[in-house]
UniProtKB/Swiss-Prot annotation:
Organism: Halalkalibacterium halodurans (strain ATCC BAA-125 / DSM 18197 / FERM 7344 / JCM 9153 / C-125) (Bacillus halodurans)
Cited InterPro entries: EF-Ts_dimer_sf (IPR036402), Transl_elong_EFTs/EF1B (IPR001816), Transl_elong_EFTs/EF1B_dimer (IPR014039), Transl_elong_Ts_CS (IPR018101), UBA-like_sf (IPR009060)
Region of interest: Involved in Mg(2+) ion dislocation from EF-Tu: 79-82
Gene: tsf
Name of this protein: Elongation factor Ts
Similarity annotation: Belongs to the EF-Ts family.
Coiled coil: none
CC terms in the record's Gene Ontology section: cytoplasm
Length: 293
């Protein structure tokens, strides 16, 4: 399989590895991105890549709660300048309020809904595009329902670059819920508990860690014990309750929440532009010059 500049670029962004290391990894794995990531990790060249870690597009993440329902939404713009525009910020807030009230099932359904009794949501966005002068788009949203004895946590970081919505069970402690949301914004866990990590993912991680240990020249009779220890570190990276609490590093999030008589039911974290690729003028040429060598 031919290794393209865009493939090298994607692997480089996902792993932080050097250009030629990325090219070699892709060549050795016949262009399989996931296997190339594992190859680099086994060689000790790259750390675990988080899912959807390419952040490039601009816009705002926004969180709003009313009663037992809350919404987290992302609206994209082309530039950071527009994301700071008051008219754009008003648009995002109005869209969030509308979506929370009408509760459409998808972005497609939302765009076709009447807005303020007249134009559709898409037409409302189009009129904003005409005024602001940039392409704007409702990228995604999620509406969450809680029970009466639960509490929502909301946190917006960097003026809307990151938004988090948390649901804390058996509690009315809004400060606790916000603190958990803030932790999620800062540390970016993938799961609440270890139980949510699939068996396939754990098996894949265990194999990568085993190859790492063997490549380090460790004796086979202690490799398994090392793997289990390192697997614990992996869970600390991806599972919220296993992580050191960002406001008190001596305490795990799980123990802290438990001390408050509460539970973490779920969280949703939006980082503006994650998974989207930004146009770059010269990078592709730089990569190709290396790939062709």
């Amino acid at each position: 399989m031919a290794i393209t500049a865009s493939m090298v670029k994607e692997l480089r962004e996902k792993t932080g590895a050097g250009m030629m290391d990325c090219k070699k990894a892709l060549t050795e794995t016949n262009g399989d991105m996931d296997k190339a990531i594992d190859y680099l990790r086994e060689k000790g060249i790259a750390k675990a890549a988080k899912k959807a870690d390419r952040v490039a597009a601009e816009g705002l993440a926004y969180v709003k709660a009313e009663g037992n329902h809350a919404i987290i939404v992302e609206v994209n713009s082309e530039t950071d300048f527009v994301a700071k525009n008051e008219n754009f910020q008003k648009l995002v807030a109005e869209l969030a309020s509308h979506l929370l009230e009408k509760r459409p099932a998808s972005v497609e359904e939302a765009l076709e809904q009447p807005f303020n009794g007249g134009e559709t949501v898409q037409e409302y966005i189009n009129s904003a595009i005409a005024k602001i002068g940039e392409k704007l788009s409702l990228r995604r949203f999620e509406i969450v329902e809680k029970e009466d004895g639960d509490v929502f946590g909301q946190y917006i970081h960097m003026g809307g670059r990151i938004g988090v919505l948390s649901v804390i069970g058996q509690s009315s402690d809004e400060e606790l819920a916000k603190d958990i949301a803030m932790h999620v914004a800062a540390i970016n866990p993938t799961y609440v508990t270890r139980d949510q990590v699939s068996e396939d993912e754990v098996a894949r991680e265990r194999e990568v860690l085993k190859q790492q240990a063997l490549n380090e020249g460790k004796p086979e009779n202690i490799v398994e014990k090392m793997v289990e220890g390192r697997l614990g570190k992996y869970f600390e990276q991806v599972c919220l309750l296993d992580q050191a609490f960002v406001k008190d590093g001596d305490q795990k999030v799980g123990k802290y929440v438990q001390s408050k008589g509460a539970t973490v039911k779920e969280f949703i974290r939006y980082e503006v532009g994650e998974g989207l690729e930004k146009r770059e003028d010269n990078f592709a040429e730089e990569v190709m010059s290396q790939v062709k060598k």
